[in-house]
Amino acid sequence: SGLITNIPLIKKIAQKNKPIILSTGMAFESEIVKAMKTIKKYNSRELAVLVCTSIYPCKDYMINLSKISTYKKKFKAIIGYSDHTQDNFASISSVLMGAKVIEKHITFKKMNFGDHKISADFKEMSKLIKGIRRAESIIGKSKIEPNNEELKFRKLYLKKIISKKKIIKGE
């Protein structure tokens, strides 16, 4: 994030023609666009642009995951999220919003200084990955049709009237 305005450095990196992850903390839209144009001019590989708030730790009201849908509309790139919160909720929520790449700091030992306080330890990282996989499962497919489990119940419940008590003919 802190180097998004360093166009000579971005150009040098782009010329390596490797996939690039561009974090956008503290950046204005015009700066993101300029960095992306530089990358795309010199690099034909994949580009991921991450929504990021460069505050450590980042409070919920600062996160603004709505940017994910804005980025998806405005930028031709893979969109992701760079998480600087102290739990996994924002990362998992970002997947539900459409993020395809997640950046989360990891540490061997939790400490109350530097990046350590916002970093996940190995147990938390494992929970994050499981949470992301669950979120992906919840998202499902965009087809408008019943899933296989619903189809099993379709014959039982579709166009039927069910009564709690016996109905006598003529009632």
State where each predicted segment sits.
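Catalytic cores and adjacent flexible loops of soluble metabolic enzymes
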Residues: S1-E171
